[in-house]
Structure formats: C-alpha cells, structure tokens
Amino acid sequence: LLERAEEQGVAPADLSICLGIPHDADVSDMKDRLAKYPRIRLFSISDRILGNSEVAIGHSSEALEQGKALLSHLIVLGFSVDDACARLQFRLHLGDDLFLEAARLRAFREAWAKVVDEFKPEHDCSHNTWIQAVVGYPEIVGSPHENVIRDTLQAISAITGGCHGLTIP
C-alpha cells in the first residue's frame, strides 16, 4: 500500500488511512517504516453498538479501555506516546438522538484526552483522536424517505460532535 501511494505521488504526510490491524498484532517492525506517515492509523477500536443510545455510553467506556490497553501495548513495543496516539482511531456507532450523540462524541474526545494525559505526551495534539462515526441502521424499517431523514440527522450529530470521518452504509 505504501509503495503504491508513493508510485502515485501521494506525499507521506497526506496519506490518511486506518489499516485495521488485529489488536494483538506485533507491529514493532512497522515502527520505523511508519515514521514518515503520521496519518496512518494501525488500529480501529469500535464501540460495536447499533442505535441504542442508552447502551452506547457503556460501550464508549469499553472503547476507551480498549484504547488505553492498545496505547500501553504500542508503548511497550517501542512507540513514543505521541506516535502511539496517532496510530489509533475510534469507530463510534450513532443512534437517533441528535443531541445525545453529538454530546457523546464530544465527551468521548474529552475522556480520551484524560486517558492520554496519564501517559504524559510531549505534544498537545496527542490528546486529539480520530473518530470515525458510523450511522446506524434503523431498527424499524420505515419509508425510504424516513430512513434518509434519520441518516441525515445522525450525520449532522456526528459532524456537530466533531468526527473526522463519517460512514453511511
């Protein structure tokens, strides 16, 4: 993938992708190679919840715990705190409550900053995290117009909440 991007003239700093590597993978051999690619994320941590806002808060805290464990794992493998933070992304699924979901994404971002603070990063930008918001499938299948409206509202809540990427299946 990296060779292909170089062949096509993509600057290393412009290549932004998440590889989605399994969480238990040994990526220590990739550390030096990825040094010039600051926007390549290795791991995606998902809250795996579809459309139930009441339960989503608990799943968000589980995602934070998984992120903290992966951060520790990367540091043990020799990554700096700052580089390890840049190699993670969170995939958060959205529900139908516009305001709750926007607030949840913002709260998640703040909670992650507190987790990162424990590791004492050198750069403040390490407190930020990539959030890939995912529009949830409706539990009740209505008319196509209703589903378009629901997806649009979820997308608005994701953007308002500060996501970096948005997946609309």
Locations of regions flagged by a protein language model:
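Generic recognition of stable, solvent-exposed alpha-helical segments in well-folded globular domains
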Residues: E62-A69, A103-A111, S143-Q154
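Conserved phosphate/anionic-ligand binding catalytic regions in large, soluble enzymes, centered on
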Residues: E146-I168
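Catalytic alpha/beta active-site cores
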Residues: L1-D97, E101, F119-E122, N128-W130, ...
